[in-house]
Amino acid sequence: MRRFSETYGQKKQITFFCSNLSITAVVIEGLLKHKEEYGALERGMDILAEAVSVTLGPKGRNVVLESGKYGPPQIVNDGVTIAKEIELEDHIENTGVALIRQAASKTNDVAGDGTTTATVLAHAMVKQGMKNVRCRSKSIAIKRGIEKATQFVISQIAEYSRPVEDTKSITQVAAISAGNDMEVGQMIADAIEKVGREGVISLEEGKSTVTELELTEGNGWFLKKGFISPYFVTDTDRMETTQENPYILLTDKKISLVQELVPIHLELISKTSRPLLIIAEDVEKEALATLVVNKLRGIVNVVAVRAPGFGDRRKTMLEDIAILTGGQVISEDAGFSLETVQLDMLGQARRITVVKEGTTIIAEGHEREVKARCEQIRRQIEASESSYEREKLQERLAKLAGGVAVIKVGAATETEKDKKLRLEDAINATKAAVEEGIVPGGATLIHFIEDLNDWAEDNLLDDELIGALIVEKALSAPMKRIIENTGISSSIIIEKIKDKDFSIGYNAAQGEIEDMYEIGVIDPAKVTRSAMQNAASIASMILTTECIVVDKKKTCSLETSIYWLVLTNKYFCLDLLRLYFFLKD
């Protein structure tokens, strides 16, 4: 008889308790292959895709999320929020859920919208790909075909996208992402027009049932640096940290030693009971560990962020933030050190929000200092002869002078908090549209099917061609689901739209085939591109997966426990058997 370690891999010990008897049994880690593996993976992916895809399009349904034992249920229409809440008991099925969930999460990280589209695309590619893998197609070649086809589609999206040139387009993009709410679309367009493209747009929970827009000039800053450690997060569902009325420590040096933090962190801030935001070149080793421990213990509500930029640009940007917040940059060049910091040298803000991708600072007051700084930057722009330097100065000026728009979200009940999620999607979609332009809405990808098919047949062979055709079939999945969510069959409508101009799509709200640009149904090109890229990436990864190793959550009977213990420790065999029969009687 061969040992389990030879047959099944590494053994694992688990302790079982029976009355006052503790027994250790040996169980193996489960390893599934081929049909079993793919079947369980598919079931998990099917469950997630169905739960998320019902929300797609203007006729999409809502999903109710349980909020635990005490909170009210939450009604949402946001794909990534739904995906994060799904956990299955079966480990293999849950792995399938987690894999498809990545497509939504990555799209949300990059574009802030399009998570449901990414999920539908990824699911369609995986389902079609698995059929071919089961028919002995080479998964690596299929992966290459998927990647090449995806690059072709992305190049087509870039070619057909239109730049956003007016407020009307911004309003339309925001309205579509907010669930066809034109009032919200207009509000976001007004906010961008007032604060500029580099300005800050922030969301707050309102105190009434009405959603309001509050504008201030020169009081906000967004830096593209997020928290150094996820242990600083205060809201694990949204993976963000929000601080009200925090102090802000600004320094251009690395913080490596605990001794550098003691004066400001433990002696000054802890006595005020106010939060602390640290913006430094970096926070390393024991200093970071100290901050995290004190955060978790509730001694100081702190979050650390790396300073933006490099070299002299970093110093000037830190000085800009210092002027905005009324603080000073702790720099050795200015004769300051962390050991000698006083409370009046720290900046202050009304609120800060830190996520993985960036930090939003909303300050109050200091308008005169900010205006003076803006004038100084304008003079530097006039004097500069370098186009690169002028561009960077313009960015700084836009950030300082752009201002802040605060949208106070009103909701009648806790259950209607979905409104805030839709507003977030709308803001992110609008910013994405400004960056990379717009394309027609209503699942534009369907128009690339014919071009992709011609390109693939001319450039690819064998299993690579199969990979490209998998992408081709998946391109119709978003439109198919949008139409099905209206309650009608999709096949006839899809065939009608395929051969028409790029701007023609299906207006699911009215049930008509129309020009999407003319009726204002448009999507950001960045959102469509990100959804396509991430769906293809996840699908390729799943199709090249050969096996999964998971823990089998399987209880072991007392007889089995003793049996394996007898095999591994014969000296205690007799005593344990006597005890077993005694307990059994």
From Swiss-Prot:
It is an enzyme of class 5 (isomerase). InterPro entries: Chaperonin_Cpn60_CS (IPR018370), Cpn60/GroEL (IPR001844), Cpn60/GroEL/TCP-1 (IPR002423), FTR_bsu_sf (IPR036644), GroEL-like_apical_dom_sf (IPR027409), GROEL-like_equatorial_sf (IPR027413), TCP-1-like_intermed_sf (IPR027410). SUPFAM superfamilies: Ferredoxin thioredoxin reductase (FTR), catalytic beta chain, GroEL apical domain-like, GroEL equatorial domain-like, GroEL-intermediate domain like. It comes from the Eukaryota. One of its GO terms (molecular function) is ATP binding. Its EC number is 5.6.1.7. One of its GO terms (cellular component) is chloroplast. ATP binds at residues 55-58, 113-117, 442, 507-509, 523. It catalyses: ATP + H2O + a folded polypeptide = ADP + phosphate + an unfolded polypeptide. GO terms for biological process: protein refolding. Pfam families: Cpn60_TCP1. It is found in: Plastid, Chloroplast. Forms a cylinder of 14 subunits composed of two heptameric rings stacked back-to-back. Interacts with the co-chaperonin GroES. This is Chaperonin GroEL, chloroplastic. The lineage of its organism: Eukaryota, Cryptophyceae, Pyrenomonadales, Pyrenomonadaceae, Pyrenomonas. The gene is groEL.
